[in-house]
């Protein structure tokens, strides 16, 4: 019987990644970024968080670590890495960023850019 588990290279090849493209944010829409952290191991996995039920927005939701872009963030990738460090203690230097996915508009008025990276 064939092993149905994906190896890391096979897993990554299923993502259609884009190089970061400079773009102007849409009018009246705040920018946010999330890290899609792929855990490096024989059978790769994704790290997700669960937001506190006491949060004002998105309470109790399962999500990737991330959040709004700050003025101190040079790029969307920098924002995703900063938020991942703040939320789940992933040091930015330990993330191998492999690309970004197209931005998604959230129901709360953010344009969210997923940043895909491999973590130890």
UniProtKB/Swiss-Prot annotation:
It is an enzyme of class 3 (hydrolase). Probably mediates the hydrolysis of some nucleoside diphosphate derivatives. GO terms for biological process: nucleoside diphosphate metabolic process. SUPFAM superfamilies: Nudix (SSF55811). Residues 29-120 form the Nudix hydrolase domain. It comes from Klebsiella aerogenes (Enterobacter aerogenes). Mg(2+) binds at residues 83, 87. Its cofactor is Mn(2+); Mg(2+). Belongs to the Nudix hydrolase family. PCD1 subfamily. Keywords: Hydrolase, Magnesium, Manganese, Metal-binding. It comes from the Bacteria. This is Uncharacterized Nudix hydrolase NudL. CDD domains: NUDIX_CoAse_Nudt7. A motif (Nudix box) lies at residues 67-89. PROSITE patterns: NUDIX, NUDIX_COA. Its EC number is 3.6.1.-. One of its GO terms (molecular function) is coenzyme A diphosphatase activity.
